[in-house]
Amino acid sequence: MKKNVKQGPAGNRSMLLIGAAMLATFAPALAQTGAGGELQQKVAAVKQSVAENQQRLHQYQWTETTQLTLKGDPKPPSQSACQYGPDGKVLKSPLGPPPEPPSGGRMKQKIVAKKKEEIKDYMGQVKGLLAMYVPPDPQHMQQAFQLGKVSLNPNPSSGVTQIVFKDYAQTGDQMTISFDTVAKKVSSVNVNTYMDEPKDVVTLAVQFASLPDSTNYVQQTVLDATAKKLVVTTTNSDYRSLGGQ
């Protein structure tokens, strides 16, 4: 006949350790069935929406208008005809006459040309950075979700849910996607990030709109490079089907 064995302090500690280990093992699965499951569904819906719309946009050409403001001084806008190339990258062809050469003496022209080249190089770096955020990358979104770096801010009255990604492309950044849960479309994206150092802050506000066939596209972006006192507003318009339909 078996005897009942009374556990001492050591036995209690062992049971607590086993319980803690079991909790650590099964907590992620439990989270998936609750709030974590809802979060995963929202992230999956965003990924699907982005992928579908990117595919549709390959069938269009459009006009991009860029307005640059440096230290509060607006520069002449520029326009480009855009469409996706075979490699999935946007091809841009300048529209309108070329920019006028700077006025003044040779020294002034040289200074102005150098400044323009510096801004052009910086903008190239900024656009390379922001390309990691817009359009949102499905792999980055999934990775952030798996690392527990994603949270939800639902707004039932509007039907729009904010999905917040932290440490999305680099440590300390944040990307917030506003997703219309009824239309299953991204309505806006807001990014807070930086260039080489956290003090070199770069923000991006993106507004989306829909074409007649319900394709979602980036209507306007406002890029603010605080350290350079540079604001770049880009507007996309006049979408036309490449098939002429």
Where do the language-model regions lie?
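Bacterial N-terminal signal peptides that target proteins for export
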Residues: 2-18
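Bacterial N-terminal signal peptides
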Residues: 17-26
